[in-house]
Each structure stands twice: as C-alpha cells, then as structure tokens.
Amino acid sequence: KGSPRSGTEGIPTIELIGGPGGGGDGLVGGIVAGAKELTDAYGPILAKGDLIVFDQRGVGRSLPRLGCPMPSDESAPEPTTKSCKEALEKQGIDLAAYDTIENAEDVHDMKVALGVDKIDLHGISYGTRLALEILKRHPDDVHAAIIDGVMPPDVPVMGMFPVAMDTILSRTFAACKADTKCNATYPDLDGQMTQLEEKLTKTPFKAHDYE
C-alpha cells in the first residue's frame, strides 16, 4: 500500500529508471548510503510519500533477465546481438513482450496491486519516454509527473548519439578556443582529441569488466 498519509501527501511516486536497461539497485543503494546528490534530489519525494523503485522487464532483478554472459576467456568472441537474441529465444523467451508499451502496462498493474487511487511518476532519460506512454495509456492513474530530460517517442534517440556527440565536442572545442584562459591551458584541444582517437583505434584497452 502507499503511505497512509492523507491527501496528496500520501501518493506514492514510482521511479522510472532510464537507459533503457538501467536497474534500480544503484539508486536505492545511493539513497540508503546518503549520497548527497541523491538525498537532495529525492528528499522532497520521500518527505511526501513512498518512493517505489523497480526493475523494468528484462533488466536488473526482474526475471527472466535479458542478458548473455560474457566468456571468461578474453580470446573467445563476445556474443553478438544476433547470437544473444537466438540464445534467449531458445529459452522460450518472447522478446516481443519487452518494450515500452509492456513496461507501461506493468506500471499500471503495479498501481492496481498497490491499491492506491493515484500515482506520481518520476522519469529521467528513457524513463521520460516511459512516463509519456503511461500518461497516454492510463492518464487516470497519474496525479503528477516529473519528466526530466525528455526522450520523445517519435525521435530515434539511440541512432542520434554519434551525431549528437560530434556536435557537443565541436561546440566544446570552439568554446575553448574562443576563451583565452581555456585555449592557453588546452591548446589545440580538437587536434589532441583526434590524436587520442587514432591512438585508441590502434591500441585499444579494456576500461571495465562486465558480466
């Protein structure tokens, strides 16, 4: 059940994690540990009612989890998207059931299971797209929504990342070059980045280990 407090103060807030593919453990752990940036951001939400964090379909602790284990032997080929898809389908997993519409329906089912009249939504990044889908499909479920960093449903955001990154870097380099202090500290920032890209292309290195 949601918080028993009366009026709007008792409406639970459902956190819509971004990604897509982000899990809730990091957020919950950070809040519990008292990380300042999280307590500052979520303190007002926690003060008014319950904060519900969940793992969306296929990620985090939800089952089945859509992931393929990485080989322990670094020389072995990493599983491609195609082979991972085929492996999951062999397990009888219907991948068509993992999308924003189904995630939105899960939130509706969660609201019903909680036995509350209304829910608040807090979405960041992909969570904003999910929030918009919930508002579209179940507007009567929602009392209020915080949409932080809109990911419109009609914009192919993932495919725009390379172009967006190039634009951001170009503007950063131009701004640094136009600033006397920055240009003196980081001369030819654009050229240095190009050299770094060429170096990493020739001699890449592993930054993290993922399972």
Predicted segments with their positions:
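Gly/Pro-rich cap/lid or specificity-loop segments adjacent to the active site
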Residues: 1-210
